Structure formats: structure tokens, C-alpha cells
Amino acid sequence: MIAVTLILTGCGNGDAEKTDTKEQTKSVEEEGKEVKIESNEGKPQHEQLIKVMMRPEADYLNDETLTVYEQDIKKYDQTNQLITNDSITLLIGDYGYYDPVWGSLDCSAVIINGTDSSIKDLSFQVSIEDSDKVIPEKVFLDNTVQELTKAQLGNFLPNTGVPIVLSFPEENATGADKNGKEINTNNLKIHIKNIQYKTVD
């Protein structure tokens, strides 16, 4: 089964130890600022040479997920792509599958950092345009990718990308289907919105 990177939560101890003023200042400088982008709709784009890197947790992925990631890296690494100015762009990968057991449509993608800063703690919402037309009589809902941390993204530099698998839950899934279905990702158009991240200074 492909490892879907959607339900990812971070936890921490709120009772942080006290540090001196110098250390506190250093911490703020490293944290950077929090950025929120409502949508990419209507924003200018430009063509950019991008570099796509394997995610840091590659050693812990199963072979199937690793293969999907490697295919998308091969597809997009060192290529010129149209990306949204000063935002996050999603490029659709080659893997697409309807999983009747989990009642979801999964597809691979590459997240591109189109900003001028290194970033971390990235989260966003995704939706499929005309999701009711992907598979007849099925509707797939929006979903949220929660805080991809630096441990998951690595050094997420400008004009670089990392692979991901997105999952869209089926509305009113019955579990009646017994067989999965491969999806032609060329027919998918995915929108990204409510983007949030922190810059790394």
C-alpha cells in the first residue's frame, strides 16, 4: 500500500526551558515568519528549472511508495516547469489509484517551493476539479495536508521540489467495490489553497 502523507501531526512540550536573551533572539531569527496564501488562482506564473529531491524519510518507506517517488523525481528533476510566483505549486505525478478498501483516490505529486525562502511546517488543502467525472457516480472530497516538517521536507530550498502522495476521500463510500482502479493522472486537475508555511532564515 502506498504511504499517503496526509494525516501528519506534530507534538511538542509547551513547558519549554527558559533560555537567556541571546538564545531566545537566535530562536526567533531561525523561526522566520509564518506565511498564509489563500489560493493560487489568478496569480502570475513563470517557467523555472527545478530540482526534485527524495524526502529524508526514504529509508523508512515501503518499496511501492519509494518506487512512486522515484518515478516522479525522474519525471520532473532538472526540468523547466510552469510554477506560481512566490507560492507553492503542485505538479501531478504518474501514480493514480482508486482504493475501494479505504474509499479514496490516491495520486502522486511533486510539491514545488516557488518562494524566495527556505520553508518548513508546510500545510495546504487540495481539491480535484470536477471530481465527479474522474470515476462515474463517485465524488471525491477535498483534503488537507497537515504540517510537513523539516524532518519530512529536508532543506526545502527555493525552486526545489519533493514527492508526495495525496489522498481524496470518497463521499458516501459504501465499500461495495471489490476491485481497485488505476487512474490516468493526465485527466486530473488538482487545486491547492489555504497554503501555510514558515520561512527559515
Predicted segments with their positions:
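Short, well-ordered beta-strand segments enriched in hydrophobic/aromatic residues
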Residues: 105-113
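The feature marks short-to-medium sequence segments in extracytoplasmic or secretory-pathway proteins
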Residues: 112, 116-158
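Membrane engagement elements in two modes
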Residues: 11-106, 162, 168-201
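Sec-dependent N-terminal signal peptides
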Residues: 1-4
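C-terminal motif of bacterial Sec signal peptides marking the signal peptidase cleavage site
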Residues: 6-10
